[in-house]
């Protein structure tokens, strides 16, 4: 389980990215790189990191499900992820 402060920091970054998305796109299209540099650092989407929605784990997160490999495996075994079954051939 990740620290709550790290999960909160990531959520805060996401809000800032959403808030400045249109302004960033307009500045980028106009080629105003000085204006871009005056925006907050956390307004850049490259500063975001995918985290597991269940555990907050930052590594090995499947984008399609938003879960880490560990949480995905546990939920899949319990049958709580629709359409996911254990492979057998």
From Swiss-Prot:
An annotated GO cellular component of this protein is: cytoplasm
UniProt keyword Ribosomal protein present:
yes
Tell me, what is one Gene Ontology molecular-function annotation carried by this entry? rRNA binding
Kindly list the biological process annotations in GO that this record carries.
translation
Q: Record's InterPro entries?
A: Ribosomal_uS14, Ribosomal_uS14_bac/plastid, Ribosomal_uS14_CS, Ribosomal_uS14_sf
A UniProt-annotated Pfam family: Ribosomal_S14
- What positions belong to coiled-coil segments? none
Physiological role: Binds 16S rRNA, required for the assembly of 30S particles and may also be responsible for determining the conformation of the 16S rRNA at the A site.
State how it assembles.
Part of the 30S ribosomal subunit. Contacts proteins S3 and S10.
* UniProt-recorded name of the protein: Small ribosomal subunit protein uS14
